C-alpha cells in the first residue's frame, strides 16, 4: 500500500509541472532584487511582425539577468492563443527565471478566456501567477520578497487584474480595479505591517491599465515627470479609490503599468511613483517607440529603488532613483 501511495504521488506530481517549481523570491547576498517588466508584447504566433518582440525579450533577459520577470498585460494579440502565450512565457521559464502575468484587455480576445489562459500559465515551470478565490479577476496575487537570509518578508509585490472594458451602462472606456480587490490589498497590507512591528513593508504594484491619477499627475506642472509621454493615459473614467488606499496604507512606493504604448514615463505623485513600462511588442499594433523593457532594482531594507529603460543593443535611457530624483531641490 505504501509503495502504491508513493507511485501515485509521483504520477500526480508529474501531471502538474507548473506547480513543481515555484521558488521563493529573496534579495541576493548584496541586498538587491531586480525585476524586469515587459508590457504589451502583443505577440501573434507565426507573424513575422512579432519577431522583434522575441529578439528584445531575449536580449533584455540575457543582459539584465533579473530575479523576476513580470508581464503586465496584452501578452498575446492573435490566435493560436495557447501557442502564443507559451512562446513568450517560456523565454523566461527556459532561463529558469521566475515570472508572473497580469492580464490586459486583449489577452482574452484571442479565442480563450482568462480562466483558460490562467490554467495554461499554471503548467509552465517557474510561473508565480496566482489567483484569489472570491476576489474579482483572474490574476490577483502577492509576491513577498524574503530578506537575503531568508528569515523574514522584506518587501511585497502586489499584482492585480485591471480587467478590460467598463461594465457600467452609460460609462465607456476601461474598467476599474474593483472594491473587493482594494479590500484584499488593504487587508494584506495591514497584515504585513503588523508582522513587521507596525512599520509598512516597502511595496510595489503591477497591473495593465493606468489609474486615473496618472493623468492628474502628468498634467500637473509641479509634478516631476521623467520619460516619454506621447499620449494621454487611457485610464478608467471612474475612480474606485485604489490610489487613495495606497496612500492610507503607507506601504506603496511605485506603481507600474502598460496599455498606453507611446508612454514610458515615471511621474512622482503624492509620494508614489506612477510609472509605465516600455512597449515590448513589434509592429502588430500601433507603436511609436522602439521596443524595450523597464527594469526595477530594489534594495533590502530601503524605501528607495532604481529604475531604467533597457532598449536594443544594451542602450539604457532614463535611469532614475526614487524618490531622490523626483524631489525638487530647494534654492
Regions found by a protein language model. Give the residues of each.
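Binuclear metal-dependent phosphoesterase catalytic core
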Residues: 38, 142-146, 242-249, 263-331
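Extended active-site neighborhood of metal-dependent phosphoesterases/phosphodiesterases
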Residues: 86-198, 294-299
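Bacterial Sec-dependent N-terminal signal peptides
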Residues: 1-21
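Beta-strand-turn-beta hairpins that frame and shape the catalytic cleft
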Residues: 24-35, 138-159, 267-274
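Acidic/histidine-rich helix-loop elements
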Residues: 36-54, 75-83, 109, 126, ...
Amino acid at each position: 500500500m505504501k509503495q502504491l501511495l508513493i507511485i501515485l504521488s509521483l504520477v500526480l506530481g508529474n501531471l502538474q509541472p507548473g506547480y513543481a517549481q515555484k521558488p521563493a523570491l529573496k534579495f541576493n547576498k548584496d541586498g538587491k532584487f531586480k525585476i524586469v517588466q515587459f508590457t504589451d508584447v502583443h505577440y501573434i504566433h507565426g507573424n513575422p511582425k512579432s519577431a522583434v518582440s522575441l529578439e528584445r525579450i531575449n536580449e533584455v533577459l540575457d543582459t539584465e539577468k533579473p530575479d523576476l520577470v513580470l508581464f503586465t498585460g496584452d501578452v498575446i494579440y492573435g490566435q493560436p492563443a495557447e501557442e502564443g502565450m507559451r512562446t513568450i512565457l517560456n523565454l523566461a521559464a527556459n532561463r529558469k527565471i521566475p515570472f508572473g502575468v497580469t492580464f490586459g484587455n486583449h489577452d482574452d480576445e484571442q479565442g480563450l478566456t482568462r480562466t483558460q489562459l490562467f490554467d495554461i500559465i499554471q503548467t509552465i515551470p517557474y510561473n508565480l501567477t496566482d489567483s484569489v478565490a472570491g476576489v474579482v479577476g483572474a490574476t490577483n496575487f502577492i509576491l513577498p520578497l524574503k530578506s537575503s537570509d531568508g528569515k523574514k518578508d522584506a518587501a511585497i509585490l502586489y499584482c492585480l487584474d485591471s480587467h478590460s472594458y467598463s461594465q457600467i451602462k452609460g460609462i465607456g472606456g476601461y474598467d476599474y480595479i474593483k472594491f473587493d480587490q482594494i479590500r484584499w490589498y488593504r487587508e494584506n497590507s495591514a497584515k504585513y505591517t503588523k508582522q513587521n512591528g507596525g512599520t509598512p513593508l516597502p511595496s510595489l504594484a503591477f497591473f495593465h491599465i493606468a489609474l486615473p491619477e496618472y493623468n492628474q499627475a502628468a498634467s500637473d506642472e509641479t509634478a516631476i515627470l521623467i520619460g516619454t509621454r506621447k499620449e494621454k493615459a487611457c485610464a478608467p473614467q471612474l475612480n474606485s479609490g485604489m490610489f487613495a488606499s495606497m496612500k492610507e496604507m503607507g506601504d506603496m512606493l511605485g506603481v507600474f503599468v502598460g496599455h498606453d504604448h507611446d508612454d514610458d514615463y515615471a511621474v512622482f505623485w503624492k509620494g508614489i511613483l506612477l510609472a509605465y513600462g516600455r512597449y515590448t511588442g513589434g509592429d502588430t499594433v500601433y507603436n511609436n517607440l522602439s521596443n524595450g523593457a523597464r527594469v526595477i532594482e530594489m534594495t533590502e531594507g530601503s524605501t528607495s529603488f532604481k529604475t531604467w529603460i533597457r532598449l536594443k543593443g544594451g542602450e539604457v535611457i532614463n535611469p532614475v532613483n526614487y524618490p531622490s530624483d523626483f524631489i525638487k531641490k530647494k534654492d
